[in-house]
Amino acid sequence: MKKIYMAFTATIMASAATAAVPAGDLRIAWDHATLRDITEIPVVNKGYTETNIMYPRIKRLADGRLMMSFMNNTYGWEPYVAFSTDNGATWQGATRLVEQVKGRSSAGDDDLVIVNPDFIQLADGTILLAYQRRWKKGYNDLAHTNENCYIEIMSSADGGATWTEPRRIYTGRCWEPAMLQLPSGEIQMYITDSNEVKYKRSQPCTTVIRSFDGGRTWQGKAHCTYKDGEIISRTIDSRGSYDGMASAVRLDDGSLLLPLEVWSGVHKMDQTPVIIKTDAATNWRSDQSIRAKGGPDYPAKKQVNKDLTGYGPYICRLPSGHPLVLAGGARYKGKPGAWVLVGDRNGDNFGNATSPFEGYWGCIDYIGDDRVMMAVTQDYKDNGAKRSKTKTAIGRINYAKKAGAPGRFVAPADFDREKNGFWFLGKEQPSQVFVDFAHTPEAFIIDAYLFDDEIRAYTPENSDAVGVLIGRRNASGDYDSYKFTVNAEGAYTLYRLEGTSWVLADSGTVPVTTVGTVNDLSDTDLGFGGRFPIRWELIGGAPAKGENIKAHIRHYYKTTAKEGPVGATIEEAEGENTDYPAEWLDVTLI
């Protein structure tokens, strides 16, 4: 029979009181439990299963469902939509919206194909979807290329159950339409405008067209062309021009923020992606000479981050006002991944990069409950044949905290892992750590839980364990650092950093509640939790009023059933450096 250890019963009834989230920093912590591979989807209106799921765009609708648009080939060929009622854990059968057809273009017999579907839900609930449509051969008939490429839109007034017929609104060689609606009702569509061709290659730039009537007309016309587009950005060098694949958000002050990749399909610049900003009054109505001479100049246009190189950027905005930029096919400090960077509320200083996996042609959006969803395209082999899938992950947002007096604490079995306000870690393994903070005149208090179905405990750091690095400013303005670790048997250590060595400051055992059997693989465990006070004199002395303490959380996970020789692996809170407490999140004492 499974043994239940209940060793911390007297005071285990409360969670550390945390006041309203301050307007400071945040980090994204990816959740291993939410990773999904979408390799195929039944197409319910056509009676077959689609096995290539590319170029995903996923957003939360007003009715609570998630909607995903996607395409089924690198260069098209058709657009689909699908819906989820369980936060992307499963997807209902897809609908193919438009079918590629045969016909004649300036190049003769040809195929009319579709690529790059993206959508928004308007303020009135209408879903507006746009895509590029082109004649496959006619696109490469360079003398007539602008006659053979279009943007079409479709809309749904019933949550995606039915759709209007496609309507052509734009003609001209182009790619990657994306849209944003402003509070005024204006809809902006951002386009990779490739109407100019030089050396048999596109010379792209980014333009915008506008609708003031819910998408019925654009640039005041039922049907506009590349000649009507308003230039936003173009990078020019001796080899040609660049800039494309735009998406945008509106910041709290009304300014608009838009990331771009800087390459032409062949050549690229050293700085990609870049971020473009316009104030509310200008609203992209900038100097149209940018088309000929390039621009805008710094600071209106700047590198997203000095350590990031990536493509196909996508942007979203959190309720806190912070923008997030996803870059696919990317490297951050030399490490490959689909990287998400956090900006400040002014749309600047992007950093604190995190990545759950590699991928390209992706999206990111806020989906509620302090969570974001990311989706990317990944290629793989299926019986030797190349296929493409969509991979998704949900990230939880860890906000800087204001910590007050300890409040009510709940036992692990009663802890709500979905809604709790704690910091979270759990990307690397099907195991999760939750941490919160409080304080009393005597101690800095850490409330912590670890959930794992196989609990192992040896020494504190060679266990399934919770770790917290603590940083406090000293008189010289530097940080003194401390390391606290506790496992399911209540064994803990507290170290003080001296130079490059950790020096033991305290150790022992503390009460914990462990639900399960430690080091027994014959059953399924739940995890452990506890409240862990660290006396102020052990970490530098009594705090100043309103002091900002820096904290960085760790997740130790033990993947072997033996104590050695293999030790526990450490998952660190991403987006910050363990050697620099200044980069860690704030815990402000109130």
Residue ranges and their predicted role:
Residues 21-402:
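Asp-box/BNR beta-propeller blade signature and adjacent active/binding-site loops
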Residues 443-452, 529-536:
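Short, well-ordered beta-strand segments enriched in hydrophobic/aromatic residues
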Residues 523-544:
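Surface-exposed interaction patches
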Residues 402-413, 461-494, 539-590:
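Acidic/polar low-complexity flexible segments
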Residues 7-15:
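Bacterial N-terminal signal peptides
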Residues 1-4:
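Positively charged n-region of N-terminal signal peptides that target proteins for export
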Residues 50, 413-436:
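An N-terminal domain-cap segment
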Residues 294, 456-525:
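Extracellular/luminal beta-rich ligand-recognition
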